[in-house]
Amino acid sequence: MSRQAIDRREFLTLPLALLLWPRARAHATAVAHTAPYRVDVSLLYGALNYRLEEIFAESVDKSGGRYEVAVTGEGDGISNRIESAGTLRQGRWAPLRTQSFFSVKGRESRSTVTYDYAARQVDYRFKGETFFLRRLRVVEDVVPMPEGVRIDDAISATLNYADQLWPAEPDGSLTTHIVRRKISSNEGPDDVQARYQAELAPFKLSVAVDAESRKPIGRFDLTRFSSWARQSQPAQITFGADRRPEQMNLPMILGTSVQIRLKTA
């Protein structure tokens, strides 16, 4: 079996994938929605398999200009917890703070991202282990917010797409920036370094209607977010009539894949 390691923050970009899903928590004046879903992870040509049963809880208060999201999930040897909050700012949803915790076979990772629009900066903190060799990656950095640059996290991007608050570029694509750990172009899954920085990574979503299903399908490049991704195999999101994700497929290197789908039964 290959001993190449998986970074916990990047565990097949599972945090990113999980945050791109519909969820809801009750709020006094907000529109609330809850949705169960399932994550199936297959590693190294099926040598390792994980299933994660999740509940997303989302509360969106458009009149008050706030949203809150809570995500909890549990599976055999795998669990996660995500809490996120944001605000309606300059006509679009913008993140304020996101905290996440993930554990896979005892390997834990924690991250906190805080957005300060008055100071025009993002505080990014992460600590996690690689999957097999348990090598540590730590990021404590502050990233400036340049004027005129669109910034999201996965939650705000999902809400902006659903509410049609994400304007398209001339070529029809949807672009924004997401704060994450800076990855070198030749980084391998087990590579670590003494000091890490955070960065505003460009995120581009190309959406087209599928000829067979007639549903919108979005594709995006994961290589800026995971050393297990490759440009020749973009991630794919299938959207429903409400412009929310129904299914996600994340093909990776070394016979690895992540599939996320709503539970209909």
Give the ranges of each region predicted by the language model.
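N-terminal secretory signal peptides
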Residues: M1-W21
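Intrinsically disordered, low-complexity regions of eukaryotic proteins
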Residues: R9-L12, A118, R125, I155
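Compositionally biased, intrinsically disordered/low-complexity regions enriched for serine, proline
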Residues: L12, L19, D141-V143, M248
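Acidic, serine/threonine-rich low-complexity disordered tracts
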Residues: H27-Y117, L165-A265
